[in-house]
């Protein structure tokens, strides 16, 4: 079963806004059980094509380990589509001389939270790539060669970081390309959520 979460409720906007940030969508469709579902599900298409929907995007989240030089951290990778800027006010929380960029024709980029940047010691514009490790799905750990049990890839800096002043995000999250994360997880159309922005906020009758 799919669940739709409303981030901003009419009549409670100020209170709810204190718990949500420029990082969060107005609406999020997730699965009731499990971690992922098929983003191409026909029911999803029906919702996304409603006239009230302005922007929708597929997102995928997974825990990972990252390493920069001799420092490591456990993080949450959030893979998003290129229209994520249209869905949220992400531009309002970016710092640095670069641009919000998820990938180009050569490499993939990671936009990190400010606290995570400090933890890893990367600085705003790191030159060396950030190593990303994810356990291979449905694979047993090879004790003789533990590294063979992980998929590894690299992320580069687009020259910006985000700061929302919430440790949950600033200290853990890395925004990157949806395709990059799907490839690391051996996924095709799987998503963690469908995030939506409405043309105007829904008014809930009392």
Question: What is the meaning of each model-derived region?
Answer:
Residues 85, 116-117, 181:
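A generic structural signal for short hydrophobic patches within well-formed alpha-helices
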Residues 17, 65-67, 98-100, 119-123, ...:
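A generic local secondary-structure boundary/capping motif
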Residues 22-24, 70-75, 107, 125-127, ...:
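Extracytoplasmic
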Residues 28-30, 57, 74-79, 110-113, ...:
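Soluble periplasmic/extracytoplasmic beta-strand elements of cell-envelope proteins
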């Amino acid at each position: 079963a799919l669940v739709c979460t409303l981030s901003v409720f009419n009549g409670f906007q100020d209170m709810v806004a204190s718990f949500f940030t420029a990082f969060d969508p107005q609406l999020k469709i997730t699965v009731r059980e499990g971690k992922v579902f098929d983003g191409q599900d026909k029911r999803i298409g029906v919702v996304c094509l409603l006239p009230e929907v302005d922007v929708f995007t597929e997102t995928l989240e997974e825990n990972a380990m990252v390493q920069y030089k001799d420092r490591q951290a456990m993080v949450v990778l959030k893979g998003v589509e290129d229209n994520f800027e249209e869905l949220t006010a992400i531009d309002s929380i970016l710092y640095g001389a670069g641009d919000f960029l998820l990938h180009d024709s050569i490499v993939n980029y990671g936009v990190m939270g400010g606290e995570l940047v400090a933890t890893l010691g990367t600085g705003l514009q790191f030159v060396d790539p950030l190593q990303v490790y994810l356990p291979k799905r449905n694979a047993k750990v090879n004790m003789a060669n533990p590294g063979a049990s992980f998929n590894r890839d690299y992320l580069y800096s687009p020259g910006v970081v985000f700061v929302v002043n919430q440790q949950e995000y600033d200290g853990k999250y890395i925004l990157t390309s949806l395709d990059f994360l799907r490839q690391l997880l051996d996924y095709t159309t799987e998503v963690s959520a469908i995030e939506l922005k409405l043309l105007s906020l829904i008014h809930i009758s009392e």
